[in-house]
Amino acid sequence: MRNFPLVLAACMAATPALADTFQEVTVTAGKTLFEAECRRCHAVDASDPSYGPPLENVLYRAAGSYEGYDYSIALEASGIVWTPAALRAWMEDNDGFMPGTKMRHVGIEDRTVQDFILAYLGSISPQDNKAIEGE
């Protein structure tokens, strides 16, 4: 028991490193899933041509607002802001979430896959995006 304070201090010192490692792994997994699920239509930035609008800085951006992309009237007029919850609903059932959209149905229903993709999208957005939990 004499070493308990030392062990406790070591555990507390290691916690940020574990959190960083977990976040890095989550973002890396999200990038891989983004490449598999989203990349055939969406690039990360405008320098890489894609069918859909680029998704860099998508978190907290107004839906239908990326300049130069021809959105559906429904999406442009929606007033939606791409919060993590809105992006999750979109990934799960974009046709149900926004009838009249031009995007084909995606149907990413696995919340873990959604979490990983959201972590990746957060990593390529300039805001201080926290871990997405419970949304």
Model region roles, listed by residue range:
Residues M1-A9:
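Sec-dependent signal peptide recognition
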Residues A9-A19:
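Hydrophobic h-region of N-terminal signal peptides that target proteins for export
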Residues A13, E35, A43, Y60, ...:
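Residues at helix-coil transition
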Residues A17-E35, V44, I132:
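Electrostatic cytochrome c docking/interface patches
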Residues D20, T83-E133:
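C-terminal capping alpha-helices of c-type cytochrome domains
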Residues V27-K31, A43-T83, H105-G107:
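Gly/Gly-Pro-rich "capping" loops immediately C-terminal to redox-active cysteine motifs
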Residues A36, S50, Y66, M98-G100, ...:
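Extracytoplasmic
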Residues R40:
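Short, cysteine/histidine-rich loop/knuckle motifs that typically chelate Zn2+
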